[in-house]
Amino acid sequence: MKYLAVAALLLGCAAPSAAAGLEELTPYFGPQYFTWKERNGGKTLLKEHGPIFCAGVRLGSVTSSSIAVRARAELFGGEVSYEGQTQAPESVPVDTRVSYFGGKGELDLGYRLETGPARLEPFAGVGYQGWFRDLQDSTASDGTSVSGYTEGWQVGYARLGARADAPLGRVRVSAEAGAKYPFYVGNTIDFSGSGKTTFHPKGRMSGFAELGAGYGNFRASLVFDALRFARSDLKSVQGTYYFQPDSSSDSFGLRLGWNF
């Protein structure tokens, strides 16, 4: 949390001098409710859920020919609860905590269409998201000690969507929605005694949405963001075969920002 607070403070201090020539420069922060699930053969293997926090900045510029270029950079992190089980063949329930810390960046190219005070902006873009997923040591329900481990995830994805905004009295309301497809997914685990192994789950179509309002320079929005992955291929580690199961993440959150 302290790193996110420092990031938010630095963004706020640097924003005024960087705002010249931009239509949008909005540092923001906020809470999210995060859920991570893994499944195999239709059965839920584990569920992680709880609050995490983010701090980031949005930038945007529109040329005289109505070409819109927009970018976002964000850090996020927090600790959530873990409800899962030990690995087969003797699966035993395990409850522990999981720490997340990561970041993401997105770059979009769009075209602005204006009808009176309302604006519509279809866009396409790319994004990168990386994070560490650190499972803490714990004790299973039968008293067995379970060692934690750390996963390092990297995801590259393409985005396609549209955003729109219009005045509503003294408030300007906005909406954004679209789909994204992960074209690269890597999950790296450092197995004791055998080094790092990277699993490559297959990307599945995922979605995102945002509903916001602005009053003066203040911005507030409700956001949803999802990632979907299909099971990876098997990999042998010291004679045992492992794989990354079908996995999904969902985040519902609030962003509060100030546009310079």
Model-derived features: where do they sit?
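Extracellular loop and loop/strand-boundary signature of outer-membrane beta-barrel proteins
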Residues: 37-47, 83-98, 141-151, 186-201, ...
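Transmembrane beta-strands of outer-membrane beta-barrel pores
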Residues: 31-37, 73-81, 126-134, 166-168, ...
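Short glycine/proline- and aromatic-enriched beta-strand/turn motifs that initiate or cap beta-hairpins
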Residues: 18-89, 251, 257-259
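Transmembrane beta-barrel domains of outer membrane proteins
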Residues: 56-60, 106-114, 163-167, 210-214, ...
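Gram-negative (and chloroplast) outer-membrane scaffold detector with strong preference
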Residues: 63-173
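Transmembrane beta-strands of outer-membrane beta-barrel proteins
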Residues: 23-29, 53, 65-73, 103-105, ...
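N-terminal signal peptide c-region/cleavage motif recognized by signal peptidases
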Residues: 13-17
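Predominantly the C-terminal beta-signal and adjacent terminal strand-loop region
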Residues: 195-260
